[in-house]
Amino acid sequence: MANYAAPAPAVQAAATLPPATAAPAVEAVALRKDFGPIHAVDGVNMALPPGRIYGLLGPNGSGKTTLIRLLTGLASATSGRARVMGVEMPSRENLARIGYMTQSDGIYPELSVWENLTFFAALYGQTNRADLLKSLELVELDTRTGTPAMQLSGGMRRRLSMACALAHHPAVIFLDEPTVGVDPALRVQFWDHFHRLAADGATLVVSSHVMDEADRCDELLFIRDGHVLATGAPDQLRARAGTDNLETAFLRFATEGATAGSEGAPAERARESER
């Protein structure tokens, strides 16, 4: 729920990455969520240093959304622990440091664009009009402030949801399929903005099932059937799988049933932190 500056020149990658020894911004320890006999999230471990973009990559139904809901404290875990900025989740007090763009449009259809944005921003004490207008400029809705959300196209509603998720300048940002329904040109602007946020120290966790966006992430977590199959930078994952194609790499890890294996990968660091 949120805001930031309008797009600047394209950024190819986050600037200087913080060291892997930085205190994790997001942690999961043996995190599990069951729905009856189904293990939607099955023993996930991760420790994500700040200032990077992490991609949760997997097919629909792989557990990405459930994992995000556990990390944000919006769902209760069957077992295990989740922490954001060192605080055990769920934590009402910690929500002000978190931005969350849901997979479905988390806005009120009867309210206007401006009313939606100011409502969500006010929940976190953000009332600066100039800042909020910059949010709408970023998503190209600044000329539609009075339009009821119900009259927006699906892509416009997604853009409004993003503006609401970023309006309070959160330190940790969870984006669940943020570019679905967004035109290609605006999608590039979004990713440029994500990289600027990470360069300024924010931590972004972005879920997607679209492989062609994966190379824009600093690190990936391949997820299937509630398990983290592998973690690492896109080039590292391709090299380990012996392919130039990330989709092929994902399928090979899924077929082999591999677990996160590279030294220093997010999931591995979580296990180290518990020893």
Question: Can you say where each PLM-predicted feature lies in the sequence?
Answer:
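Catalytic Walker B motif of ABC-type/P-loop ATPase nucleotide-binding domains
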Residues: 173-177
